[in-house]
């Protein structure tokens, strides 16, 4: 892979030419596309639940806030804008500031203002790319006040806050959040740490993954899971970094030690060598592994816990007997006893259906793996793009008039693309009409921005850019107006120079001025 390393100290030398004409052409073209997409989404929408920004305000919200993206894959591009259009619906003003909702209708298991922490990691990953940082600043403050509710479901909150900080650095945000984050971490240790087993445990449902195959192996659906243990590692590591930033040396050493311990126990205790996968150990049993691979076994890769020697686990993602399906990935390997897709019992089952929540985790994990370790075994750019396209194409529904419309809901039939929970709830005349419509339980835009195009802000204020497109896949693309570490980043690729009328190759702009160029889009740029 060709690599470019460019420091900010060289910017004066490199930015003598302002390619404003190219950027203006892109802005005008994409602005028109945004208008068209919003018009389509609005016309196809039954606006049942309205929060801060209704559909009439959707176009202005997107124009004011989101990074612009265009590419040759128009279905992927449409899904990108659709997910921003739906995220906007979940921005909710309250007397105490903004929160980001999961469901649009109020549901009885939510906390104050209908907030639920379960998808928090996805909501922060996605929302950090909005220009207006107030939404997530307020939302973070909400969880710091509602500390008990922040532990109602598994939620790597310190990690999520730090990811937001990387895009919108503000030391006062860290300083204000840090005491509450320490309390939340301590609460997990007091309630979910099993000293005898040397692991954290969780109910599958409070991981947000109810009716799981591994959960059924314990009489109370509890287990020592790679999810909660990986989240606790990620939070300890984030708290150590925050402590260092704040000059809290003693805290830094404590949390570093906790993180190192957790990384070791995930690798030593939750890795099934015979299956070459991270698995659940059901609680109240003989400490043996669940016999099945479940998709959440990829979660440790989100946080850099495994080393390269375990990358063969990624072959399962593209194996039709593993997790691959037309509208997958499936939540359980398809070869396993216990895998099923049914329309009876609980409407939210994690024993086979495809869940956007899990798909987003897995794609984040795969992107991080390739960015960190390079391609290896099944961890390839081809696997990432193939799975991202499958995920994108799953964001569809055929309506009553036979028209295909963009849609995001709770869980999918991995073989037909039907939204299972929706079908079941409609049949039972459920009181919350269209409960899962526009469901804000996963990320997608972040997978394009930080994954596919590879914009990765760092704690120290640097920005690494490494696209994950297989060489020769696209002839052109542009991702512009990305707010990142106090700067505005744009990445423009044109193989021939004919599409945008610019120099062939990939150009990176910082604050509208050229900062780097490569002849290919296999590039790593440190700004």
Residue map of PLM features:
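Non-catalytic carbohydrate-binding regions of carbohydrate-active enzymes
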Residues: 157, 246-280, 312-487
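Well-ordered alpha-helical scaffold segments within catalytic/enzyme domains
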Residues: 62-74, 113, 121-131, 157-173, ...
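Extended glycan-interaction surfaces of carbohydrate-active proteins
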Residues: 74-113, 128-144, 190-224, 264-354, ...
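C-terminal motif of bacterial Sec signal peptides marking the signal peptidase cleavage site
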Residues: 15-16
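C-terminal beta-sandwich/jelly-roll accessory domains of carbohydrate-active enzymes
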Residues: 475-527
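Acidic/polar, glycine-enriched structural segments that form the non-catalytic walls/loops
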Residues: 21-111, 171-173, 182-187, 243-245, ...
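The feature captures the catalytic groove of carbohydrate-active enzymes
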Residues: 26-50, 57-60, 147-155, 189-257, ...
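Positively charged n-region of N-terminal signal peptides that target proteins for export
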Residues: 1-4
């Amino acid at each position: 892979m060709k690599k470019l390393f460019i420091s900010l100290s060289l910017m004066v030398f490199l930015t003598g030419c302002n390619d404003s004409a190219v950027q203006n052409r892109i802005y005008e073209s994409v602005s028109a596309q945004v208008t068209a997409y919003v018009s389509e989404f609005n016309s196809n929408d039954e606006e049942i639940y309205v929060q801060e920004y209704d559909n009439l305000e959707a176009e202005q919200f997107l124009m004011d806030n989101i990074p612009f993206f265009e590419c040759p894959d128009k279905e992927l591009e449409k899904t990108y804008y659709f997910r921003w259009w739906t995220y906007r619906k979940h921005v909710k003003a309250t007397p105490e500031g903004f929160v980001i909702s999961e469901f649009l209708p109020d549901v009885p298991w939510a906390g104050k203002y209908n907030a639920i922490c379960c998808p928090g990691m996805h909501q922060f990953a996605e929302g950090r790319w909005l220009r207006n940082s107030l939404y997530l600043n307020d939302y973070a403050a909400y969880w710091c006040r509602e500390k008990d509710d922040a532990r109602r479901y598994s939620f790597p909150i310190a990690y999520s806050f730090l990811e937001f900080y990387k895009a919108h650095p503000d030391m006062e945000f860290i300083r204000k959040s840090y005491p509450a984050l320490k309390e939340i971490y301590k609460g997990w240790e007091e309630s979910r740490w099993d000293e005898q087993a040397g692991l954290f445990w969780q109910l599958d449902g409070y991981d947000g993954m109810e009716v799981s195959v591994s959960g059924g192996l314990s009489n109370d659906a509890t287990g020592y899971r790679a999810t909660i243990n990986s989240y606790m590692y990620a939070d300890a590591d984030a708290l150590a970094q925050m402590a260092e930033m704040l000059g809290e040396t003693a805290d830094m050493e404590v949390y570093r030690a906790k993180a190192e311990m957790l990384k070791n126990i995930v690798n030593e205790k939750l890795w099934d060598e015979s299956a070459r996968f991270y698995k659940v150990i059901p609680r109240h049993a003989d400490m043996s592994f669940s016999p099945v691979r479940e998709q959440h076994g990829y979660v440790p890769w989100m946080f850099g816990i495994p080393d390269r020697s375990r990358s063969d686990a990624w072959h399962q993602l593209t194996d039709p007997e593993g997790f691959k399906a037309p509208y997958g990935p499936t939540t359980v390997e398809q070869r396993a006893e216990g895998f099923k897709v049914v329309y009876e019992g609980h409407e939210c089952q994690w024993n086979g259906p495809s869940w956007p929540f899990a798909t987003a985790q897995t794609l984040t994990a795969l992107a991080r793996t390739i960015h960190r370790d390079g391609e290896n075994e099944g961890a390839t750019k081809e696997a990432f793009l193939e799975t991202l396209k499958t995920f994108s194409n799953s964001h569809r529904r055929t309506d009553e008039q036979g028209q295909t419309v963009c849609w995001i809901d709770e869980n999918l039939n991995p073989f037909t693309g039907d939204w299972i929970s929706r079908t079941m709830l409609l049949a039972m005349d459920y009181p919350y009409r269209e409960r899962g419509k526009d469901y804000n339980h996963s990320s997608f835009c972040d997978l394009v921005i930080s994954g596919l195009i590879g914009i990765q802000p760092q704690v120290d204020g640097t920005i690494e850019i490494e696209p994950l497109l297989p060489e020769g896949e696209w002839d052109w693309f542009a991702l512009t107006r990305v707010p990142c570490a106090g700067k505005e980043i744009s990445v423009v690729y044109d193989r021939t120079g004919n599409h945008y009328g610019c120099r062939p190759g990939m150009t990176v702009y910082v604050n509208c001025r050229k900062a780097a160029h490569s002849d290919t889009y296999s590039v790593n740029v440190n700004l």
